[in-house]
């Protein structure tokens, strides 16, 4: 992996990874059908107090991280590499999500800064021309892998290109209908105003001595 950045003009938030592929021979590579499993090596970076608190939902209490802190599957992608000789640099697009029900998304959202330690595990098929001009195929060994430390800044820039200053929360249809009705009944101007009002009420109840007595 050579670099990473937001993919321009993508329909959804997408990180572009620059992948260098070396043929290792003088044969003409006609195509590569490349499958990549991308894992987050969560054990390979430190976490500040705020990050530890936010990661409680993913890994549990920090005191248990010796057994619960583990690698997370982020994505599995398939890429068709066009013909090349010797080596080539291709873009590997990886779509991002705000769906915090997915463990990897919850992990990435919890990070404040630094880098995300990633592991790329490759498999697939290479189609190439032999010296005689015959079409040959070869399998990519399962032990082919690469590491890359993705700056958290790149992730934030990628999400901001589509949802600047915003985030998305998935709720059930029933919960949404209740929230919508609450907003309509009180003639609130936006869902931000609606949620803020509910949170303010909950915080006021928690600080009320009568509430604590109950």
Residue ranges of predicted features:
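Extended, solvent-exposed segments with strong compositional bias
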Residues: 54-109
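Short beta-strand elements
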Residues: 53-62, 127-168
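Short edge beta-strand/loop segments characteristic of extracellular beta-sandwich folds
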Residues: 18-22, 170, 180
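Short aromatic-acidic-glycine turn motif
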Residues: 39-50
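Surface-exposed, Lys/Arg-rich phosphate-binding patches that contact polyanionic backbones
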Residues: 173-190
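Short, basic amphipathic alpha-helical segments that act as recognition/interaction helices
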Residues: 189-211
């Amino acid at each position: 992996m050579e670099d990473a950045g937001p993919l321009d003009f993508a329909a959804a938030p997408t990180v572009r990874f620059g992948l260098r592929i070396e043929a290792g021979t003088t044969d003409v590579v006609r195509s590569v059908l490349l499958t990549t499993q991308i894992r987050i090596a969560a054990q390979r970076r430190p976490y500040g107090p705020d990050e530890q608190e936010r990661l409680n939902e993913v890994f549990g209490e920090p005191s248990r991280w010796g057994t619960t802190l583990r690698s997370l599957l982020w994505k599995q992608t398939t890429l068709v590499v066009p013909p090349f000789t010797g080596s080539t640099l291709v873009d590997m697009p990886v779509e991002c999500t705000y769906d915090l029900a997915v463990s990897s998304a919850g992990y990435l959202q919890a990070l404040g800064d630094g880098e995300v330690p990633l592991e790329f595990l490759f498999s697939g098929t290479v189609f190439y021309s032999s010296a005689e001009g015959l079409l040959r195929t070869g399998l990519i060994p399962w032990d082919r892998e690469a590491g890359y430390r993705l700056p958290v800044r790149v992730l934030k820039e990628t999400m901001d290109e589509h949802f600047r200053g915003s985030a998305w929360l998935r709720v059930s249809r029933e919960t949404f209908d209740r929230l919508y009705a609450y907003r309509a009944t009180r003639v609130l101007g936006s869902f931000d105003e609606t949620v803020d009002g509910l949170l303010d009420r909950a915080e006021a109840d928690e600080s009320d001595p009568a509430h604590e007595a109950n």
